[in-house]
A protein has these predicted regions:
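N-terminal pre-Walker A segment at the start of P-loop NTPase domains
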Residues: 1-14
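Hydrophobic positions on the alpha1 helix immediately C-terminal to the Walker A/P-loop
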Residues: 36
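Sensor-1/coupling segment of RecA-like P-loop NTPase cores
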Residues: 122-141
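Interdomain motor-coupling "hinge/lid" segment immediately C-terminal to the ATP-binding subdomain
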Residues: 142-263
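Accessory nucleic acid-recognition modules appended to NTPase machines
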Residues: 221-386
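Conserved catalytic cores of phosphodiester-cleaving nucleases, focusing on short active-site segments
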Residues: 362, 387-408
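Conserved small/polar residues in nucleotide/adenosyl-binding loops
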Residues: 447-454
Length: 456
């Protein structure tokens, strides 16, 4: 089953760019990287070579690489050993602009990863490298070549992509809805969209999970597939840790993230989310887990695309920006799965899931080419209160205060900050409204705006 993905357009932009670079495609395990890259390659290049360093093709290529690069001192050096390696692997290989070489799971070999600069500079062929656990390339033996790489991140399906896959007619109606006011002629449309969003919140956007739901229309069956994906990730992660022997360590971190998100008292007791998580995990689960190991596990989850960090702007002073002050999940289905295991009430879960949804969409808009400023999405404190998110456009410099509400409530802290000139606009993203604009305060449905993507 083909699920239409927005990232396909980014792949085309890379191919057509006059700057010749190696494309690094990153993203969490099972987000569909291999499928979309191979589809793109098949449709846009005359010849494709696919190597997965995690399976037999990788083993075979490494044998070709070793044979092509072997050299005895005192003898003539090979003129093009890297070209020879690909020729040994695929006798039909030609170094032309219409050839693409895909090296999957690149993190499995520092030797090949460190050749990226040469792939970029000495080949006419295009190179795409990808991996699910690129956190490993931060280790010393991996030499990063930033000037030769264009990076693209593939996320799980967005709500828009899920809606289009589920019901194209409903998707077209969704696109026609006005964002700045209510359309009272189609009340049933708002109800339909809310129902789809509720399903999306429960299952998230992993392609196999979405496919399962599309085939069965069964939320529980889709969640079962999600659990399978989570377990694959946890078990595979164990390969990269010598001092973690039980996958429950990662589960404990996930549950601790949920409990921090569910707290009524805002802010952290510790200086960073990593320190707060380490304290919770060792207190509630394993006092034998070292601080260093816990930090590495959290970092691993971040670089594997499972969690993301959120900054904090103290007293709405953008010069007082503190990164890594909160943590969110990068897929709504994963967030739902773990939040539902904390014993939280439905209304409390709703609030956390909606905030997580907005976080994911703001994160996407900070990928190149960036549309909003700051290193990561950020929340803010002001006059003893808190504002869910602050976003400022890169081109127009308009600053938005964003408040996420499950119902029809208002946000006194954000209103106060707006009145005192701390921002240009206040944007309410609500679960129970049809939208509207009053002055510089705009309200819209969470799921009709795809988390402010068309507003800011």
């Amino acid at each position: 089953m083909y699920l239409k993905r927005k990232v396909y357009d980014q792949l085309l932009d890379w191919k057509n760019d006059t700057v010749h670079s190696t494309l690094e495609v990153n993203g969490a395990r099972q987000v569909g990287k291999t499928y979309i890259i191979n589809k793109f390659a098949d449709e846009n290049f005359r010849h494709k070579i696919y190597i997965n360093l995690f399976d037999l093709s990788g083993k075979q290529f490494m044998e070709c690489y070793k044979k092509a690069t072997d050299w005895t001192p005192g003898t003539k050096r090979p003129e093009q050993p890297l070209h020879d390696a690909f020729k040994l692997f695929d006798p039909d290989f030609e170094d032309t602009n219409d050839t693409v070489i895909i090296i999957d799971e690149i993190q499995e070999s520092s030797e090949i990863f460190n050749r990226i600069r040469e792939f970029t500079r000495y080949f006419q062929a295009h190179f795409i490298v990808t991996g699910s656990y690129l956190g490993r390339v931060l280790e010393p033996e991996f030499k990063f070549s930033s000037g030769d790489i264009t990076s693209i991140r593939i996320y799980t399906l967005s709500f828009k992509e899920f809606l289009e896959a589920l019901d194209d007619q409903l998707f077209q109606k969704y696109l026609s809805l006005p964002l700045d006011h209510a359309d009272d002629t189609v009340p049933e449309l708002y109800d339909e969209l809310k129902n789809v969003y509720d399903i999306y919140r429960q299952i998230g956007g992993y392609p196999k999970v979405v496919e399962t739901y599309l085939n069965t229309k069964d939320v529980e069956a889709a969640q079962k597939e999600l659990v399978r994906i989570i377990r694959i990730f946890l078990n595979e992660s164990m390969r990269y840790f010598d001092d973690i022997t039980d996958i429950s360590v990662f589960t404990n971190i996930f549950l601790s993230i949920c409990r921090i998100l569910l707290r009524e008292k805002k802010g952290l007791d510790e200086d960073s989310i990593s320190e707060e998580l380490q304290k919770l995990v060792t207190k509630n689960y394993s006092s034998n887990l070292s601080k260093a190991t816990c930090y590495r596990a959290i970092n691993w989850l971040y670089h594997s695309g499972i969690i993301g960090f959120c900054g904090k702007i103290t007293e709405l002073d953008i010069l007082n920006f503190k990164p890594g002050s909160r943590c969110f999940f990068m897929d709504l289905g994963v967030a739902y799965y773990y939040l539902s295991r904390t014993g939280a009430t439905v209304s409390t879960m709703d609030g956390s899931l909606n905030e997580n949804y907005v976080y994911i969409n703001l994160s996407k808009r900070q990928e190149f080419p960036e549309e909003i400023i700051f290193e990561t999405p950020a929340f803010a404190t002001y006059k003893g209160g808190e504002i869910d998110f602050v976003a400022q456009t890169l081109k127009t410099h308009i600053r938005y205060l964003i408040e996420v509400k499950a119902g029809k409530g208002t946000a006194s802290t954000a209103l106060k900050a707006l009145e005192q000139g701390k921002a240009n606009k206040l944007l309410y993203l609500k679960g129970d409204t049809k939208g509207g604009t009053v002055g510089n305060v705009q309200t819209c449905l969470l799921y009709t705006s795809d988390a402010a993507d068309d507003l800011i």
